């Protein structure tokens, strides 16, 4: 193997230390860069205005024209310029399917002939009437010391009833499974709120509006919590998720049928049904719930905080005032639970971790609502609802 070539010496143009051979001449980087810029000058610009200049004491030229002349005299050659290299940055937009078709990604697969102008209306008036009756009926349960414990007891009772039933594994999620899950989830939320003493003091219109607005966010967190509990007790595997009352799915092995609600395929609707990092965030939230293993009191506060915060932001006005007051009352009850019952003087770290889970779900739901609005603009779905405010995040 030949010995390495060491290029040393002085620059043939200015006499400074050389950095190698540039354009056929041993020169420094400064003179090489200068020649690369100045070689394209026209003849008039190359003429020295003073006649002939000399280099200064430190080897620098006072005249650019004479410096260029010296570069040419020592043999620098413009034919050695390399002009066929790749650009460091390209001004052209990289070609993609979206740029090729000239359509945004979120309507990339939107085929106008599949859009549904005429829609089938799903009437949920019966569900709303059932909810109204449930919220008006008096509770017969013995009330605990405060409403947060009351909600925790209600949640435990609902889950106790389901624990006696065999878990059903769903392999295909279609129209029947979806509508059943929605109905069960909505009525479950109504039952829970009907045992909330401060909530029952609100007027009938306000109670119904809040429940209709927040039931989906409540259900999402409830199923996440229930999944974590069953995984802790070794009743479900890591890839299995609760999706309804006593029903679960294997997230790695299931089929979704959307033919009943849209003319588009699941592949075409990935943008609308999948949020960025949605699956990853949901799995991480389940793991966080497993690690924290919150009590029924803590889970009830999380459910209340997430659902009422969502309802207040969507409804505004007197609903916002009511939800803020309800959350504040339960925050005080949670403080008493930590300090008086658990004897925790400093619980801020644990509460922060619990609230991080609700914020993750809240962000996911917000994205779902925005995508649902886009889908409505382009008539992606072929179904509508008698009470559309209930299904803005589905």
From Swiss-Prot:
Domain NR LBD residue range list: 134-394
Keywords in alphabetical order: DNA-binding, Metal-binding, Nucleus, Receptor, Transcription, Transcription regulation, Zinc, Zinc-finger
InterPro entries in UniProt: C.elegans_Orphan_NR, NHR-like_dom_sf, Nucl_hrmn_rcpt_lig-bd, Znf_hrmn_rcpt, Znf_NHR/GATA
MF terms in GO: DNA-binding transcription factor activity; sequence-specific DNA binding; zinc ion binding
PROSITE patterns, per database record: NR_LBD (PS51843), NUCLEAR_REC_DBD_1 (PS00031), NUCLEAR_REC_DBD_2 (PS51030)
DNA-binding region location: 8-83
Keyword Hydrolase included in the entry's annotation: no
Gene3D superfamilies named in the record: Erythroid Transcription Factor GATA-1, subunit A, Retinoid X Receptor
Keyword DNA-binding in record: yes
GO cellular component annotations of the record: nucleus
Lineage: superkingdom: Eukaryota
Subcellular location field: Nucleus
Zinc finger (NR C4-type): 11-31, 48-71
Main localization of the protein described in the UniProt heading: nucleus
Entry's family note: Belongs to the nuclear hormone receptor family.
Role of this protein: Orphan nuclear receptor.
Name assigned to this protein: Nuclear hormone receptor family member nhr-18
The organism of origin for this protein: Caenorhabditis elegans
Gene: nhr-18
């Amino acid at each position: 193997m030949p010995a390495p070539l060491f290029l040393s010496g002085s620059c043939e143009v200015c006499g400074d230390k050389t950095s190698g051979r540039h354009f056929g001449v041993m020169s420094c980087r400064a003179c090489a860069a200068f020649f690369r810029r100045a070689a394209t000058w026209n003849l008039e610009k190359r003429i020295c205005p003073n006649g002939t200049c000399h280099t200064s004491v430190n080897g620098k030229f006072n005249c650019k024209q004479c410096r260029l002349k010296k570069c040419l005299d020592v043999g620098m050659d413009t034919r050695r310029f390399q002009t066929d290299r790749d650009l460091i940055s390209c001004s052209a937009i990289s070609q993609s399917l979206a740029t090729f078709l000239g359509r945004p990604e979120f309507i990339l697969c939107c085929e106008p002939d599949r859009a549904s102008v005429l829609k089938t209306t799903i009437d949920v008036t019966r569900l709303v009437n059932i909810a109204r009756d449930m919220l008006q009926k008096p509770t017969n349960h013995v009330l605990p010391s405060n409403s947060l414990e009351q909600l925790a007891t209600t949640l435990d009772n609902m889950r106790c009833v389901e624990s006696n039933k065999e878990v059903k594994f769903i392999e295909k999620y279609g129209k029947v499974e979806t509508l059943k899950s929605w109905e069960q989830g909505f009525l479950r939320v109504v039952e829970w709120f009907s045992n909330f003493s401060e909530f029952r003091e609100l007027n009938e219109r306000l109670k119904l509006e809040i429940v209709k607005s927040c039931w989906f966010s409540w259900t999402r967190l409830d199923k996440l919590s229930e999944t974590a509990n069953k995984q802790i007790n070794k009743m479900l595997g890591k890839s299995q998720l609760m999706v309804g009352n006593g029903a679960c799915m294997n997230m790695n092995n299931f089929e979704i049928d959307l033919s009943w609600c849209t003319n588009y395929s699941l592949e075409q609707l990935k943008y609308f049904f999948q949020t960025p990092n949605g699956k990853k965030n949901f799995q991480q939230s389940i793991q966080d719930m497993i690690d924290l293993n919150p009590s029924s009191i803590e889970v009830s506060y999380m459910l209340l905080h997430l659902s009422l915060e969502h309802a207040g932001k969507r409804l505004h006005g007197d609903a916002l005032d009511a939800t803020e007051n309800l959350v504040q009352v339960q925050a005080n009850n949670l403080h008493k639970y930590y300090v008086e019952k658990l004897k925790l003087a400093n619980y801020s770290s644990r509460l922060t971790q619990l609230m991080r889970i609700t914020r993750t779900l809240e962000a996911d739901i917000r994205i779902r609502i925005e995508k649902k609005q886009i889908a409505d603009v382009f008539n992606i779905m072929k179904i509508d609802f008698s009470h559309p405010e209930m299904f803005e995040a589905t």
